[in-house]
Amino acid sequence: MIQESARETPIFHEADICVLGGSCTGVFAAVRAARLGARVVIVEKQNAFGGVATSGLVNIWHSMKSTDFKRQIIAGLTMETVERLKRIDGVVEQKEKGETPGHFILNTEELKIELDGLIQEAKVKAYLHTMFVAPYVRNGELEAVIVENKSGRGAIKAKMFVDATGDGDLCDRLGLEQRTSSLYQPSTTTAKVDRWDEAIKNHHLGELFLQHKEEFNLPEGFGWGSHIPGTKSVYMYAGTRVYHANSADGEQLTFAEMEGRRQVRGVMDLLRKYADGEKMSLVSLPSYIGTRETRHINCKYQLTNEDVLYGRRFDDAI
């Protein structure tokens, strides 16, 4: 243990609502609150908004309809963003049944710019490259959060805070009751690959993996992905699986990032050797791994299986 010196922390900003985490969820919460008249600030540790969709390269928005495909259950700012992307040919719509949307395939680089626009148009104060460090609690009330960025260490004061960090970082630092799974869902490192379709068009990907995964030390699982709108032959592939890693733990997250990238290389080596991947090339990797599960915060209301399966509506939906 070391003892840090006492210090005074400057206030970077004050608002009605502070949103920690600039995923699409965080952005939509911030924009909606601002449109309703609140003064809002949003804090994101990456260089862009959009979370797993942008920094994680996951370019599919799915489950737009109820399980019987009769009712659209996701709309609002999600669909507004889709319409913005349509204007620049940054999205492809895939209908599953009927005429309501099934899922959307996005160019997530274009999505970054559209989310910037939503934030700016709503006059939300934004901090990118800014890391949440600690809560500031006085007299039992959360008054501010401590953050750090290139300007140094500072505080953001607000009347209300939204934890959109994905891992419940604010709730965890506040010591709120939480639970964890005995077996985490695996994390996935995606990849943008050029000439992917050409590499596998004469092969069955699943059979190749079953036959040769041990040679490249690849885990069991399944792969999926899609072509990137606006490109000629770039494909987003999501088929790696990092098991038994808690991405809310610093050391385990580091392992997961490195192992996920190793698996991407293994997949490409497999296809170069046993398929037609000689001309295939790696275009980009995500700035962080796609995490499916870490902490579960015990909230006032907990979603049930029925809520999800039947698309239950809530009066306070964003």
Regions found by a protein language model. Give the residues of each.
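Extreme N-terminal leader/targeting segments of oxidoreductases
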Residues: 1-17
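Conserved N-terminal/central alpha/beta ligand/cofactor-binding core
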Residues: 6, 32, 38-39, 44-134, ...
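Core beta-strand elements of the Rossmann-like FAD/NAD(P) dinucleotide-binding domain
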Residues: 13-15, 151-160
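N-terminal Rossmann-like FAD-binding beta1-loop-alpha1 element of flavoenzymes
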Residues: 17-41
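Short hydrophobic core segments
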Residues: 20, 156-166
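Mobile, glycine/GP-rich and aromatic-enriched active-site lid/loop segments adjacent to catalytic centers
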Residues: 90-106, 121, 173, 180-318
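Conserved beta-strand-loop-beta-strand element in the redox core of flavoprotein oxidoreductases
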Residues: 136-155
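Flavin (primarily FAD) binding-site architecture
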Residues: 163-176
